[in-house]
Amino acid sequence: MVGRLSLQDVPELVDTKKKGDGVLDSPDSGLPPSPSPSHWGLAAATGGGGERAPVAGTLEPDATVTSVVPNPASLSHSLAGICSPRLCPLSFGEGVEFDPLPPKEIKYTSSVKYDSERHFIDDVQMPLGLVVASCSQTVTCIPNCTWRNYKAEVRFEPRHKPARFLSTTIIYPKYPKTVYTTTLDYNCHKKLRRFLSSVELEATEFLGSDGLLDEC
């Protein structure tokens, strides 16, 4: 007895050309599931040096990764080409000159602090009775900024004489000077009192987000 069975709403049969060996793994095939070969098994079967032949219409995983992940060496070269030399503090000098000399020894203290900002602070203390009571200086280098702030301050006593001296130097890149000097001359009763300070800068390479003056 021969007849024809017609079913409705039945999906089409799996195309063996597109699915490959996947048909053998289906429960309706009557065959046990075939183990999926590993990458090294395919490489050994082809006899290649760890490479497998690409399938038509697909992309190899290595090719996709290479197109997305940039080369670190190329990034460093590109950043080095963008960065320009930057002036950083090289040395800092300060001096106070008195004529006549003070009767006692003058104490001089200095300190350097490295933090999110760069500070160089020094202080001069002298015995009571002298005109200049204190002298302090500060050099501030702010990270990720194109200017340098330099401040010098001298205080005088008693109060009827000049009480304070303040100077600020802002260094712009378009004026590439390396040495800045500030001088204060003070004459009281024909006695010379002189205050000198200087800042010296050098050019160094700078990479935008890597810390400030970590390389300075």
Swiss-Prot record:
Keywords, comma-separated and alphabetical: Cytoplasm, Cytoskeleton, Phosphoprotein
Any one GO MF annotation of this record: filamin binding
Keyword Phosphoprotein: yes
Any one annotated GO CC term: actin filament bundle
Top-level taxon of origin: Eukaryota
Coiled-coil segments: none
Record keyword Cytoplasm present: yes
A Pfam family recorded for this sequence: FAM101
Main localization category: cytoplasm
Record field: transmembrane: none
Location in or out of the cell: Cytoplasm, Cytoskeleton
Matching InterPro entries: Refilin
Region (Disordered): 1-52
Modified residues (Phosphoserine): S6, S26
Gene Ontology terms describing biological process: actin cytoskeleton organization; actin filament bundle organization; epithelial to mesenchymal transition; negative regulation of bone mineralization involved in bone maturation; negative regulation of chondrocyte development; skeletal system morphogenesis
Subunit structure of this chain's protein: Interacts with FLNA and FLNB.
Protein function: Involved in the regulation of the perinuclear actin network and nuclear shape through interaction with filamins. Plays an essential role in the formation of cartilaginous skeletal elements.
Protein family membership: Belongs to the Refilin family.
Protein name per Swiss-Prot or TrEMBL: Refilin-B
